[in-house]
Swiss-Prot record:
Coiled coil: none annotated. This is NAD(P)H-quinone oxidoreductase subunit 5, chloroplastic. It comes from the Eukaryota. Belongs to the complex I subunit 5 family.
Amino acid sequence: MEHTYQYAWIIPFVPLPVPMLIGVGLLLFPTATKNLRRVWAFHSVLLLSIVMIFSIDLSIQQINSSSIYQYVWSWVINNDFSLELGYLIDPLTSIMLILITTVGIMVLIYSDSYMSHDQGYLRFFAYMSFFSTSMLGLVTSSNLIQIYIFWELVGMCSYLLIGFWFTRPLAANACQKAFVTNRIGDLGLLLGILGFYWITGSFEFRDLFQIVTNLIYNNEVNLVFLTICAVLLFAGAVAKSAQFPLHVWLPDAMEGPTPISALIHAATMVAAGIFLVARLLPLFIVIPYILNLISFIGIITLLLGATLALAQKDIKRSLAYSTMSQLGYMMLALGMGSYRSALFHLITHAYPKALLFLGSGSVIHSMETVVGYSPDKSQNMVLMGGLTKHVPITKTAFFLGTLSLCGIPPLACFWSKDEILNDSWLYSPIFAIIACSTAGLTAFYMFRIYLLTFEGHLNVHFQNYSGKKNISFYSISLWGKGGLKTVNKNFCLLTLLTTNNESASFFSNKTYRIDENIRKMTRPFMTITHFGNKNTYSYPYESDNTMLLPLLVLVLFTLFVGAIGIPFNQEGMDLDILSKWLSPSINLLHQDLNNSMDWYEFVKDAIFSVSIAYFGIVIASFLYKPVYSSLQNLDLINSFVKTGPNRIFWDKIINVIYDWSYNRGYIDAFYATSLTGGIRGLAELTNFFDRRVIDGITNGVGVMSFFVGEGIRYLGGGRISSYLFLYLSYVSIFLLIYYFLNL
């Protein structure tokens, strides 16, 4: 075992040769390097697979031995200061290593096909491999300085990947927004690290925990300053994990390629913030009010993310807000001190979310064959629908990922989310009510995404429908955007609500019109042969096997990964692998490791949480599933939506909710007005002060000198006798004044 741990330092550097060799190859041998691009993709997958095997071996040893291994090299700079570099292998590290490598391999395999026709194929794989290196270095770091170095590298890689298609203004703006927003958190992280070094004199985690605990116990430290430093550390996690109020970069990050979205949202960048809080949890526990702040930020984020996902039209942005909400659950669990629940949800959420993003990429890929390369159209759920018969494998995988995120047993997220909900009742009933309500919202918006994407008819082909048997009824939608329409009985309600009629659209105040030449569009930034004018398709088609294989593997993880945390410890049967895995870290937190639960208590709690999820699913199915065809012989819809004052009032309320959700809670607009506008106003004021005051003084002195010189030049005639006469005259005047003043 010791022999294996000794070589763990190599883990972050295994994927590093790929970006280095690609960079050197493109610089020295560009043609040959581009011709061998599939070879570089193979090596990217191969090297990350080696890291995965190594990580699995380390994890097995962690489970069997319940030990923590740390190795440190000391770099002595002088007698007063030495910098220690090393690596730390504990349960948290091994969990993150497996998440990063397994999800990363699936994304790399998927990307080989998804990015195959992109001119930046090699650049993409270089960025991805360096991203993996940065994240692996982050999770194996043994001190705060190493964490900060790799933290910044992760931020740099995310900037490059979000702005991968930098020629698109939206992508360029999105990567800048992510970069600037994360700089705010990174500044807090740096100040917090320096503050704790000033207090403790060490960057090492163990020294930090012990010294701070002793200082607080002996009342030898200023608690206010200590709390401020802890809040600054937490600010770094808030920005990186897209927690309120620094969450605004996450939806815009969807401008990058879809495989990047899967990697960022499942196992890398957003998980880094959760990892940091989990790593520093022994420190946060002993500092007053920090856990309360963490849980408060978590509960706000999970509710805000769920509500903002309700009205999004872009499939990737909807999933982005879903990620934000689920990260809020993890942060809430950490704030409650539920270390096991938070990491359990981190594991179970990673695979379904990667599955959903890769599934959405498959949907987008198939839609581009119809609408061309236009993210506004290929990612717009208004134009989708009826994809079940066109992409059946993608549909099945996406459906299972949706069920998992909704918390339906026995899929992965059910086990972890149910555990967080149970812990929340013990922590705060108010927080528990919000968390349970958000679970219902999660089921609602996830099934909304699924139904709009796969059920009904392909809306991009729908123009107008006319039939023989028509009836009039008031079209309903969640957002009260309906009107009196003529509808054929044999046509679905959902298709009707997305038509280009005079009344408002199902999703916005303005009708979404489809260009007549939409199928003749080509990619402005990619060259894909079957997307040209010669080979167009009337309907989407299923992705190739290279893209489907990762989906199927992630389906297996989604089905079975929750089994590692099943809390049934009966006589002669110990199924709780996760608690055994996390026992060293839980012992460090001085928490009770006994997590057993009898069947009756578990089933009772599970029925409640699953009932909430099913309630959200039923509401989503009623509003979004094309049920009208099955109710065509009943007049339920017309009787349900009678017009009147109550209906009008309800529509107004729903419109307000819709506008608030669709406009991201007006938070981006507030930041643009207050922060961006304020900084711009300050810049204009500074420019005015610089040009009018500073430059005015400098230029004024020059102008005054010029006029004084000119005046003197005209007074002087060039005769010395005149100068002497003026000099004596002035001296005489001053003498007379002095004489009269002294009388």
